[in-house]
Amino acid sequence: MPHVSLQNVTKLFGEDTIALDDVSIEITAGEFVVILGPSGAGKSTLLRILNGLTEPTTGTAQIGGSPVSESGSDVGMVFQMHYLIESLSAYRNALTGALSRTTNLKSILTLNQTDDKRAALRALDTVGLLKDAEQRAGTMSGGQKQRVGIARALVQNPSLLLADEPVSSLDPKAARDVMRYMKQAARERELTTVASLHQVNIAREFGDRFIGVRDGTVIFDGSRAELSMDVIDDLYYAGSESTPVSHGDIEGQGEGLTKPDDTSVSSDMETTSGRDHSTGTDTGTDTGTDTETDTETDTGEAQL
């Protein structure tokens, strides 16, 4: 049984706008799938259907053999905008991911259960931000904020992680950092991951399988080796009078294909909750485009 299944899904907005047109996709547990396509192709609509934020007009969407509406916290979502509470620490923002796992008013008000705290710290460690757990979100770079967004989704303990253009506003270095940590989280936690990206170069580095969407229709479904320049030209430039361009030009950086950085952070999570945050293992610098300079500090947030 596939972990994710879309069968003959069509989504209409109004009477005339077709966002998705008879889309059928099956995704196996543990796959890291990247959805490619030009703006307005239907990528975000597809992810919103998988997350239960919108319903298909016709067709069925299932996760683990059950309707998406029954999946609840089994689905974690990373958005294009991080939607962090910038006055709170990275730790407190990650901790809000626990809200999806309870409807108990007392739990929502306190968010201080030991298991939730441990989950938040483990998630920050997974994305290389444990040493920055007490830093206010408003003082972080764009790339760091997106990594906190990933951590927040991981606190839900999902089996499916969705990411809608998570690196579209970042420079290539920060984008690769975010994608590397996302790929690492998927590997460590055996997550099924579906991410929409428009940077073809970065997508090729991290995806295992690629689904190309154009005008609401799936026109390609294959491996990295099968994602040829002809496929990319057809996906992005079919019907256009513009000259097809290179992989790097699509990304906007004019660079060739490169292999992902294999650097990883510590996977020893059993003692995370007792670790000094100054010993967290963040690899490399983050040059995200968000450069807010709020210098207030958030103290003592992550103490158990």
UniProtKB/Swiss-Prot annotation:
One of the record's GO cellular component terms: plasma membrane
InterPro entries linked to this entry: AAA+_ATPase (IPR003593), ABC_transporter-like_ATP-bd (IPR003439), ABC_transporter-like_CS (IPR017871), ABC_transpr_PhnC (IPR012693), MetN_ABC_transporter-like (IPR050086), P-loop_NTPase (IPR027417)
Electron transport keyword on record: no
Residues at which ATP binds: G37, P38, S39, G40, A41, G42, K43, S44
Listed Acidic residues bias regions: 289-304
Composition skew (Polar residues), residue ranges: 263-272
Tagged with keyword Transport: yes
Entry EC no(s): 7.3.2.2
Catalyses which reaction(s): phosphonate(out) + ATP + H2O = phosphonate(in) + ADP + phosphate + H(+)
Residue span(s) of domain ABC transporter: 4-240
Gene Ontology molecular function, alphabetical: ABC-type phosphonate transporter activity; ATP binding; ATP hydrolysis activity
Record's bilayer topology term: Peripheral membrane protein
UniProt-listed SMART domains: AAA
Region named Disordered: 240-304
Major subcellular site: membrane
Localization, UniProt: Cell membrane
Keywords: ATP-binding, Cell membrane, Membrane, Nucleotide-binding, Phosphonate transport, Translocase, Transport
Alphabetical list of Gene3D superfamilies matching this protein: P-loop containing nucleotide triphosphate hydrolases
Complex formation: The complex is composed of two ATP-binding proteins (PhnC), two transmembrane proteins (PhnE) and a solute-binding protein (PhnD).
Classification via PANTHER family: AMINO ACID IMPORT ATP-BINDING PROTEIN, PHOSPHONATES IMPORT ATP-BINDING PROTEIN PHNC
Role summary: Part of the ABC transporter complex PhnCDE involved in phosphonates import. Responsible for energy coupling to the transport system.
Family to which the UniProt record says this protein belongs: Belongs to the ABC transporter superfamily. Phosphonates importer (TC 3.A.1.9.1) family.
Name recorded for this polypeptide: Phosphonates import ATP-binding protein PhnC 1
Protein's organism: Haloquadratum walsbyi (strain DSM 16790 / HBSQ001)
